[in-house]
From Swiss-Prot:
PANTHER family: 50S RIBOSOMAL PROTEIN L33, CHLOROPLASTIC, LARGE RIBOSOMAL SUBUNIT PROTEIN BL33C. The keyword Ribosomal protein applies. Keywords: Ribonucleoprotein, Ribosomal protein. Signal peptide: none annotated. This is Large ribosomal subunit protein bL33. One of its GO terms (biological process) is translation. Belongs to the bacterial ribosomal protein bL33 family. It comes from the Bacteria.
Length: 57
């Protein structure tokens, strides 16, 4: 058996604004701790305010 690569456990994801749908942030997440889609409150430069950003595939 081979060891899992870090990219398998921590894949790169894109966060998109839920209001204007613009993809503003690129980050990684731990698939074991958060198997469902990530939701974070981040600043959207297009909206000019803090909005909920959801993980896109």
């Amino acid at each position: 058996m081979t060891m899992a690569k870090s990219a398998d456990i921590r894949p790169g994801i894109t966060l998109a604004c839920t209001e204007c749908k613009e993809r503003n942030y690129i980050t990684t997440k731990n698939r074991r701790n958060t198997p469902d889609r990530l939701e974070l409150k981040k600043f959207c430069p297009r909206c000019g305010k803090q909005t909920v950003h959801r993980e896109t595939r």
